[in-house]
Amino acid sequence: MTLYQKYETDNAYNYLQQIIDLLEEPICLLGGWAVFFTVNELYKKETGSDYLGSKDIDLGFHIDMNFKEQQLKNTTMGKTISLLEKNGFQSQGSRYYKDISIENGRELTSEESKNEPAHNVFKMYIDLMVDNVHPSFRKIFNFDPLDEDLLNLVFEKTTMRTEITTFKKLLWIPAPEILLSTKIKSLPNRTEDKRIKDICDIYAISFFSNKKVTELMKESKILLEKDRFEKLKPFLESDDDFLTAAEHLLVDGESIKNLFKELIKT
């Protein structure tokens, strides 16, 4: 049983390499691929398999609230948007995408995509997220950005990020406690496949990163308001999601449920 189809994660990984090659260092990587690079070494040592990949690419950007409009255009965010557009990615708000043929992996033009059966088209998404929403952002870039205030810590404090060299580029990856906190925040609003992936990620970060689970839980409770953990309580009403996540993680479903019980404790 697979969470995502192999062509989805393979395509995303290939495009991740291409995008990283285009961008200026350091590159802040978020989401599922950030979790992958955080946990994969220990996870593979424990299970013999690579950790779950992602079907999307998530990138983070610092926005200085004091920037003038021209400075905003010249930020890493602005340069990234220009590069994506020059390389054929289409805008869908804060998401950029390409349509890919599932049959042969070929990039499709807009016209070709319209003429293809929907089941033969995979949308390769790149999500752009900022730490601060500049008042002129929409005027300059014509969309409202996704924002995450915890990203401020990643850009401000070296202790809140892990710096790795991958694909010959310097990547900044949020520290495990930041990744865990963002997953806890996003989980209650997720639809099925994303929900299961977030549960997997919460467990993997807790047990396969370079920090002890007790330390991570303590730090996440400093970073997040109490109500964020309260919103996890409905997940304890059924074992279904935990059992599904356990199949993907190659672990016991009860251990995932027990982790959630500990997270919910005040």
Short names for language-model regions:
Residues 1-266:
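Compositionally biased terminal segments of proteins
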